[in-house]
């Protein structure tokens, strides 16, 4: 039996969305191959029996399972799936030290560890497992799909490519060697300072407060979600953010390099008006470029939708389409 960390899990319902009367819910844990114990919420249809198709959900990058990944998981459970929404390593209720770090390798492994966990459950059909990655975890989901042949279908919703945005800045505005070098210099200077002090500083959260009047719309959009209607005390984006050096390894470890070798089905869902739309469009184009596996790949553009509409707006998130996609591709 794999050794697990002892986690402190909250017993009461503390999600940012109402609890459904149509599903059963409980907390579970599982361990990844780095020995980090992950905390998850498991949802399944009430009065369930037999083996179910299963879906693992995570994201956004810096969020917790009590926010929109849990909403996705609970909604898909209402539609007949056994689902889990998990906190990534180093965040939320999951284990891993130091806290508030991110890693393209470990975070991809988190998804694969979720598949491990689901595959051996007696109430799951191991041949019918899919994943959903939201925002920055959309890119991680594609990377997991490129590596894990057990994943039958993948949905990337309102996705980011975290390696691209860390290396190039928003809208590729820093896509120059000198800009990247300056960023590396700054981060490595900070590494030395913080190692000397023996503690890590925090990056300051997803958005500043108060939000400047001239801030871009997407910054205000994030603020309304993370600081407003879906604030959660364990969410990095709702509070003090990642460690200041927590995401630096994303700068030179591109996670989508082999996406055109994904043989299983992929649905990328993005809002037409989202500031992040270019991530989804480009990820789709790169996935089908010079690929032999294009027939089961799809980009779904939601007219008029902005980035966080696909976080928690039930009138915008295309759950009917997502359910149909999974069923048509072996997860249902």
Label the model's feature ranges:
Residues 4-50, 311:
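N-terminal cap/lid segment of alpha/beta-hydrolase-fold proteins
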Residues 101-122:
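Alpha/beta-hydrolase active-site loop
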Residues 62-74, 88, 280:
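The serine-hydrolase catalytic nucleophile loop
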Residues 262, 268-270:
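Short beta-strand/loop motif that positions the catalytic acidic residue
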Residues 142-228:
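Alpha/beta-hydrolase-fold enzymes
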Residues 305-315:
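Catalytic histidine-centered segment of alpha/beta-hydrolase-like enzymes
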Residues 75-95:
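Conserved alpha/beta-hydrolase
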Residues 51-60:
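Short beta-strand element of the alpha/beta-hydrolase
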């Amino acid at each position: 039996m794999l050794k697990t960390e002892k986690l402190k899990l909250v017993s009461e319902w503390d999600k940012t969305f109402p609890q459904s009367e149509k599903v059963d819910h409980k907390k579970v844990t599982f361990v990844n191959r780095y020995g980090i114990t992950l905390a998850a919420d498991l949802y399944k249809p009430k009065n369930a029996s037999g083996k179910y198709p299963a879906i693992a959900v995570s994201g956004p990058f810096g969020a917790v399972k009590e926010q929109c990944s849990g909403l996705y998981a609970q909604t898909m459970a209402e539609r007949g799936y056994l689902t889990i929404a998990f906190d990534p390593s180093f965040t939320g209720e999951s284990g891993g030290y130091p806290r508030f770090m991110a890693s393209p390798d470990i975070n991809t492994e988190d998804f694969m560890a979720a598949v491990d966990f689901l595959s051996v459950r007696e109430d799951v059909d191991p041949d019918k497992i899919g994943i959903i990655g939201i925002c920055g975890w959309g890119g991680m989901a594609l990377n997991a799909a490129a590596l894990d042949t057990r994943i039958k279908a993948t949905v990337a919703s309102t996705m980011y490519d975290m390696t691209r945005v860390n290396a190039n800045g928003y809208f590729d505005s820093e896509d120059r060697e000198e800009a990247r070098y300056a960023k590396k210099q700054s981060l490595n200077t900070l590494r030395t300072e913080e190692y000397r002090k023996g503690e890590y500083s925090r990056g300051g959260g997803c958005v500043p407060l108060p939000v400047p009047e001239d801030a871009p719309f997407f910054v205000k959009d994030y603020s309304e979600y993370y600081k407003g209607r879906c604030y959660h005390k364990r969410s990095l984006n709702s509070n003090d953010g990642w460690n200041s050096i927590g995401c630096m390894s994303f700068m030179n470890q591109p996670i989508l390099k082999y996406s055109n070798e994904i043989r299983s089905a992929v649905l990328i869902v993005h809002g037409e008006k989202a500031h992040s739309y270019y991530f989804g469009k480009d990820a789709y184009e790169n996935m089908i470029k010079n690929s032999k596996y294009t027939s089961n790949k799809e980009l779904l553009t939601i007219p008029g939708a902005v980035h966080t509409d696909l976080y928690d707006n039930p009138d915008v998130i295309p759950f009917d389409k997502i359910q149909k996609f999974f069923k048509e591709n072996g997860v249902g």
